[in-house]
Amino acid sequence: MCPLRSLLLISTLVLLHHLPHLSLGRSLPTTTAGPGTSCLDYSQNLLRAVSNTLQKARQTLEFYSCTSEEIDHEDITKDKTSTVEACLPLELATNESCLASRETSLITNGHCLSSGKTSFMTTLCLRSIYKDLKMYHMEFQAMNAKLLMDPKRQVFLDQNMLAAIAELMQALNFDSETVPQKPSLEELDFYKTKVKLCILLHAFRIRAVTIDRMMSYLSSS
């Protein structure tokens, strides 16, 4: 992987990390990932699913300040994970040649990469991504439980998105990992819950883009 490509990757990750109000684009069809699917395919499926879910939420909750310009942006992984730093291309961190790789390698149980052997830095990156996914999965499940109690039955989380998160988590296979967070259990205010849904979906879509960029980088390196 040449330095120019790595610099482009990390610039994209930092931009996504600090500019949460990027344009959303059109809804994309959701595909079902099958056996033997790589983590790049899973991450692309996840990005499609969260983009579709966010678009539907914006349409349904048009009177709830659900656009990226109107919401108060929040990152539930802040100070709990460090995906951008953990996924920094090794050559940028060590200033070695464009083919640099750390000698230490680990055997992973997941099937994200073609080989079961991955570098120490790659393992840290994938573990951080797993923690991100687990945090959002827990938060979305708790939020969906609240939405199901709403008498208006106005909006629910798309099960395709929850399934896409679970599929990528299963592929990463860091089941022993714990996350330093419990789902927020605020008062049962359906208006606030719907606004929070918009906030989380916007934040998670940005994180899904970051994950997809990293999986693309890892798959081609």
From Swiss-Prot:
Record-linked Gene3D superfamilies: 1.20.1250.10
InterPro entries, alphabetized: 4_helix_cytokine-like_core, IL-12, IL-12_alpha
Main subcellular localisation: secreted
Gene Ontology molecular-function annotations: cytokine activity; growth factor activity; interleukin-12 beta subunit binding; interleukin-12 receptor binding; interleukin-27 binding; protein heterodimerization activity
Subcellular location: Secreted
Transmembrane segments: none
PANTHER family on file: INTERLEUKIN-12 SUBUNIT ALPHA, INTERLEUKIN-12 SUBUNIT BETA-RELATED
Signal sequence bounds: 1-25
One Pfam entry name: IL12
Glycosylated residues in this chain: N95
Gene Ontology annotations for the cellular component aspect, listed alphabetically: extracellular space; interleukin-12 complex
Subunit structure: Heterodimer with IL12B; disulfide-linked. This heterodimer is known as interleukin IL-12. Heterodimer with EBI3/IL27B; not disulfide-linked. This heterodimer is known as interleukin IL-35. Interacts with NBR1; this interaction promotes IL-12 secretion.
Alphabetically ordered keywords of this record: Cytokine, Disulfide bond, Glycoprotein, Growth factor, Secreted, Signal
Similarity comment: family membership: Belongs to the IL-6 superfamily.
The gene coding this protein: IL12A
Species of the source: Ovis aries
Keyword Disulfide bond (UniProt): yes
Disulfide bridges in this chain: C39-C112, C66-C198, C87-C125
Protein name per its UniProtKB record: Interleukin-12 subunit alpha
GO BP annotations listed: cell migration; cellular response to virus; defense response to Gram-positive bacterium; extrinsic apoptotic signaling pathway; immune response; interleukin-12-mediated signaling pathway; negative regulation of blood vessel endothelial cell proliferation involved in sprouting angiogenesis; negative regulation of interleukin-17 production
Function: Heterodimerizes with IL12B to form the IL-12 cytokine or with EBI3/IL27B to form the IL-35 cytokine. IL-12 is primarily produced by professional antigen-presenting cells (APCs) such as B-cells and dendritic cells (DCs) as well as macrophages and granulocytes and regulates T-cell and natural killer-cell responses, induces the production of interferon-gamma (IFN-gamma), favors the differentiation of T-helper 1 (Th1) cells and is an important link between innate resistance and adaptive immunity.
